[in-house]
Curated annotation (Swiss-Prot):
Transmembrane segments: none
UniProt-recorded name of the protein: Extracellular metalloproteinase 4
Listed GO biological process terms: proteolysis
Cellular component aspect of the GO annotation: extracellular region
Residues that make up the propeptide removed upon maturation: 1-9
UniProt keyword Metal-binding, yes or no: yes
Function: Secreted metalloproteinase probably acting as a virulence factor.
Cellular localization per UniProt: Secreted
Gene Ontology molecular function, alphabetical: metalloendopeptidase activity; zinc ion binding
Cofactor requirements of the protein: Zn(2+)
Family named by the database record: Belongs to the peptidase M36 family.
Keyword Transcription attributed: no
Amino acid sequence: VHSVVDYVSAAEYQVYPWGINDPTEGNRTTLHLPWLKTLSTDWHIDGKGWYSTTRGNNAIAQENPTGGPEYENNYRPKSPLFIFKYPYSKAMTPPSSYRDASITQLFYTTNVYHDVLYILGFNEKAGNFQINNWNKGGVGGDYAILNSQDGSGVNNANFATPPDGQPGRMRMYTWNASIPERDGCFEAGIVIHEYTHGVSNRLTGGPENSRCLAALESGGMGEGWSDFFATAIRLKPGDTRATDYTMGEWASNRPNGIRKYRYSTSLTTNPHMYVDADGLTSVHAIGNIWASMLYELLWNLIDKHGKGDVTKIRPVLKNGVPTDGRHLAMKIVLDGMALQPCLPNFVQARDAILDADKNLTQGSNKCEIWKAFAKRGLGVGAVFNLSKRTGS
C-alpha cells in the first residue's frame, strides 16, 4: 500500500492545463498532482482501491469507438507509476493514434471541474457525481462515465443525467469539419458544457429528479448554463467586458463558433433580447439568449469585485462567498439552480439568482444583477408566455 501511495504522490498528466480552452490558446504541459488537495480524495481512489488508470471516485474515462453502452472493459491507458504522458499534436491522424492523450485530457478536465464545482457548492448533498460520498450525504455510486472518441456520433457531444445514485455518461465525439479531424476532448469548453448539463439537471428540482429541465424553455436554459460556465472558466487575465467569446470554434472549425451570436456585452455584436425566444424551437437557440444575459451578469460582478487571478484553479472564498466577481457569478448561478422550481422559465430562473445572492451576500449585488437582465429585456416587468413574451 505504501508503494502505491508513493506513486500516486508523484502522479503526472501531460495535458492542456485549466484555463486553456483548446490547442490554439497554448501548449500541453506536464502537471504534477493537479487535484485540489483539501478535498476528500485524489482522482485515483474511491475508498475501495487505487486505480493506475483513468479511473477514480469522480470519473472513469475510456475510449468507446463502437458507441455502445459498455464502458468498464473498454480500453483506457494504464500506468503503474501514475505517469499519464502521451503524444499528441494537431497534425496527428487518425484520432485513434492519440487515444491515450485524448482520454487523459478528458479525465483531467472533468476532474478539475468536479473539484472547482465542489468548492462552489456542488457537493455530495447537492447530488454530485462520485462513487463514494464519504458519509457526507447524497447518494453515491455515480461517478461520471467519460467516453472519448465515442463512435455513436460526430460533430457533437452529450451528457445523460439520471437521478443521484446512478452514473452520468458523457459522450465526446470527433469533429470532421477540418483536415485532419479534431477531437472534442481537447476543447475544454465542450467538456465543461457537457458536464454542466449533469450539474443543472441534478440541481434543478433536486438530485432525485433529473427531468426538471425537460420543457422547451428550461431545456434552453440548460444549454445556456452550460455555455456560461464554459465561457466564465476560459477568461484570460487581460479580458475586459469588451472581450467576446464563441462556443465550439476550434472543434467545429468555425471562427464564429456554433451559436448564432458570440457572447458579448455589445448589443451590436450580440443583439439578443428576451423576446427573441418567441417562436424558437431549438434549445440551443434559446440557450444562446440565456447565456448572453448571464455573460452580462458575469461582467457586472467582475467590474464590481474584480476578476481575481484567472490563472489559479481554486476559487477563493471568504465566509463562503467568492472574493472575485467571476467565481461569485458562478456561485450564485449555481445556487440559483437549486432554488428555482422544476421546469423553470427565464423569469423564475432570474428570480432564483436574485434569491441566491440575497442568501449569500444579503443582496449586495441586487443592482448589478437587475441591470444585467434588464439590459436584455428581462427586467422587472418581464412576463413569460411561451409564444408571446413581454420584455422589460
